[in-house]
Amino acid sequence: MEYVAIDFQTANRWHKSACSVALVTVKDGKIIDTFYSLIRPGILHFDKENTALHGITKEMVKDAPYFDELWPLIKEKINGKTLVAHYARFDMDVLEEELTGNKLAFPSCPVFCTCVLSQAMFPEMPQHRLQDVTEKIGFNLEQRYNAMAQARACVAIVEYALKATGAEFLQDVADAYHFHLGYIGKDVVTECNFIILIEGVRLVMRILMLLLLCKSPRLITIWIT
């Protein structure tokens, strides 16, 4: 079983401002490849709040490759593999914005969110930030906002869950904790989310429909059956 942990850092509040990326490829529980690069954003503007977190400045990326220059290598490493990220919605938004903005072809990848996994594994925890989860499982996250450190932390969380459940595949872990994997592909990006939440929305919709039809019992009977 092979997957790739991925993490982006951004230069500013806009998702299309990736300034670093890290990939950690894992096969059968062992790291077989790592990749890290700074990225020069299309608009070379860094919010001071972002720099305060990850320490990357515009001077550091002025000679770095643009995202579209890196993409062929990144795509080769991730295409067809499950992507793992903490709060994957952010990283997939960054990836989607960069691909769309640069008119690049999307990969085809299932998406596994370790934040959703943590919420399922440790419901008693008040927060599920990466540093909280790694502390819970006994993994030392040395640099909280370094892309490579965060990607390695995601690997640690996944391997912890695989061992805890006795699962062989990430889909088995998702099934054990009752959530769906997300997906990124051509013209579609779906989030990793709890099955119970999805079913809950459907139940609420059915109840609302019943309330709307409550003045006509005959319609309710027809609709239910």
Task: Give the residues covered by each predicted segment.
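Conserved beta-strand -> loop -> alpha-helix junction used to position metal-binding or nucleic-acid-contacting
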Residues: 105-118
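Conserved non-catalytic scaffold segment of RNase H-like nuclease domains
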Residues: 1-108, 123-145
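Residue-level recognition of specific faces of alpha-helices
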Residues: 114, 133, 172-175
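Acidic, divalent-metal-coordinating active-site segment for phosphoryl/phosphodiester hydrolysis
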Residues: 146-160
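Acidic two-metal-ion nuclease catalytic site recognized across multiple nuclease folds
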Residues: 158-224
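Generic alpha-helical structural context detector
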Residues: 116-119, 135, 156-159
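Active-site flanking residues adjacent to catalytic metal/cofactor-binding acidic residues
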Residues: 6, 112, 149
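Short, glycine/acidic-enriched loop or turn micro-motifs at the edges of active sites
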Residues: 10-12, 116, 153
